[in-house]
């Protein structure tokens, strides 16, 4: 996963912000407010990130939700911008720091990786990680 971000940066040195996403595999994550969902355009540019299920399939379309992994590749310029810029309105509402870039028109390129991850945001998440580790050790 890290190698994919590094490779992308080397192939596209002009990109200031790189981030990673992966398909959501567990249905519960779609509605979980601890799982950040990402919508990109056809060129893998970030359009929006939310704790809500996005995009919303109004007509029941079958879609693949993508989740934010939080592995960033930032240029020095992007890092300095982030450190000096005020938290934005949507960033405060959603509590997602990448929205600071979105609201300030700084493009985020998302690299899709095949990585099953478990977010640890609440004490009850620890049991899920322990179960996954135990299962992996038993293989």
Residues covered by each model-derived region:
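Conserved alpha/beta core of the MobA/IspD/sugar-nucleotide pyrophosphorylase nucleotidyltransferase superfamily
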Residues: 58, 63-139
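Conserved core of the sugar-phosphate nucleotidyltransferase
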Residues: 1-85
